[in-house]
Amino acid sequence: MAAQPLETVLNHPAVWRGNECARVAVPSVPTGFAELDAVLPGGGWPAGALTEILSERPGMGELQLVMPAAARLTQSGRWLTLIAPPYIPYAPALVSHGVHLSRVMLVKTASAEESLWACEQSLRSHGCGVVPPWLDRTPERSLRRLQHAIEGNDALALLFRPGRAIPASPAALRLHVSKSQSRTLVRILKRRGSDIPAPIALDLHGKLVGRTGPVRAAANQLPIEEVA
């Protein structure tokens, strides 16, 4: 058999180079942002694995970042389970992103332990499509419990955490979000593949669906279900 040129071998889909995004055949859900999907293994949010989204404070665009995926999954009948958010989500804003309010569950907790428990149970449930808990100081062993809970599931575990969160984490993907004028900067801290040196600037507001129709339709949707 004739030897193949080295470049031909290196360009084979089964070969991964350390300076490129990992080519992995893993389940994923598109983020809704082509620039971000292009640099994520699998082309979207990893399903069945933890993703951490870090920010210096709530309201830096972290929730808007996951709205396209949340809309896709709630429209298919899966639950969006919001665990211990720092503020009550504005229902018309969710609708403007295409989220079905009838598939949104708001879980109120009294402690970090309750938040972790609620997150773990949600990740074990195959009815939940997107589980974004707001977690503060969470030890690595607790994160590993969450990773174990989501294994074998195709849900998205998108953990919102403060920017000072410890670097040691079992999460397959870690992002940091910050504001820059009218755009949101997304910096990849960890992924399967090489690092991304420059942040990606995203226009989160450009993903809103037509405001008039969907927002008006919010009155006809069921209210967000709350669980205490």
Q: Where do the PLM segments sit?
A:
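Detector for small/aliphatic-rich hydrophobic stretches
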Residues: 1-82, 96, 101, 191-194, ...
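Hydrophobic/aromatic beta-strand patches that form the interior of the parallel beta-sheet core
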Residues: 51, 81, 105-107, 132, ...
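Long, charge-dense
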Residues: 81-138
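A contiguous pocket-lining binding segment that forms or flanks enzyme active sites
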Residues: 123-168
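Short glycine-/polar-rich loops that comprise or flank the Walker A/P-loop
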Residues: 77, 100-102, 127-128, 153-156, ...
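Phosphate-binding/switch region of NTP-binding enzymes
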Residues: 157, 161-218, 226
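A short acidic, amphipathic alpha-helical/loop segment
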Residues: 65-69, 93, 118, 142-146, ...
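Glycine-biased, small-residue-rich flexible motifs in mid-sequence functional cores and linkers
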Residues: 77-81, 91, 113, 121, ...
